[in-house]
Amino acid sequence: MKPGFSPRGGGFGGRGGFGDRGGRGGRGGFGGGRGRGGGFRGRGRGGGGGGGGGGGGGRGGGGFHSGGNRGRGRGGKRGNQSGKNVMVEPHRHEGVFICRGKEDALVTKNLVPGESVYGEKRVSISEGDDKIEYRAWNPFRSKLAAAILGGVDQIHIKPGAKVLYLGAASGTTVSHVSDIVGPDGLVYAVEFSHRSGRDLINLAKKRTNIIPVIEDARHPHKYRMLIAMVDVIFADVAQPDQTRIVALNAHTFLRNGGHFVISIKANCIDSTASAEAVFASEVKKMQQENMKPQEQLTLEPYERDHAVVVGVYRPPPKVKN
């Protein structure tokens, strides 16, 4: 094992991500910075930190307790809430916010106010004469949200960024990335399945910063005329050759010094080896492709045997004094 490489596996404070200090401090990944908290004060495993009601609220199943009707029974939906007893504050990742109410939740600022993408909770906060709407981001449905709540040091996705998203599926996480990069950013969303692709195209009709690409990510040359150079690649493809897939796309579209965020599902790569061995093997493959991993983080308790690896592509050479 390389010196300075200490992947942050397993142990988390409290309930891991929700406990007193979500990510477990220590040195983040490949000699990266410290993994700071990221966890919330919520209780139990219900989505954004609440009782057992689906998306993380109490019995009504919502993330925001600020007026509005109670849901029907456990886990019922509550509609758009007015944020009287709710406070939204910026997370340390630019473009991501924490909604503090009776329970805390991770949220993003809705690019298309009034529109819910996958039935997620929304909350409106009055700022002067304006109302700003935020959307709850469930870490059990999004690897990126799980990584943020687990205390990942950097996601490199921020307002104005151009992001290539491989394995976009129906666009659950893509919609939140679209919120983060905002009107000045772009999300190129690549998905091979035509059924999911239909959802993605419908999503892009309302969110003009999403460009859906219904193609196989193994063949970036087929869509090279659709995509400009990007700042970040996010990959959630769950394929045995996923590092090769990401590398092919990085060589074609990722600028030198750009970053990658890869979600690794150990079972999809080698179901016979331990998760730690699979992660270490994938990291080695990345290093052979001019991809320099800087941080590794497991996604417990939200996903089992998953890890996220964050790194830089073709970093500029260090200047010797």
From Swiss-Prot:
Q: Which residues in this protein are found as N6-acetyllysine? A: K102, K121, K205, K206
What is the annotated localization of this protein? Nucleus, Nucleolus; Nucleus, Nucleoplasm
One Pfam family, short name: Fibrillarin
Q: What class of enzyme is it?
A: transferase
Q: Where Phosphoserine occurs, residue numbers? A: S116, S124, S126
Region described as Helical: 274-306
Residues binding S-adenosyl-L-methionine are T172, T173, E191, F192, D216, A217, D236, V237, A238, Q239
- Here the cross-link named Glycyl lysine isopeptide (Lys-Gly) (interchain with G-Cter in SUMO2) sits at K84, K102, K109, K131, K143, K158
The question of whether Magnesium is a record keyword is answered with: no
Effect of substituting K121Q: Mimics acetylation; impaired ability to methylate histone H2A
Matches recorded under HAMAP family: RNA_methyltransf_FlpA (MF_00351)
The protein's name in its UniProt record: rRNA 2'-O-methyltransferase fibrillarin
Which organism is this entry from? Homo sapiens (Human)
**What does the organism's lineage look like at the top?**
Eukaryota, Metazoa, Chordata, Craniata, Vertebrata
Q: Which gene encodes it?
A: FBL
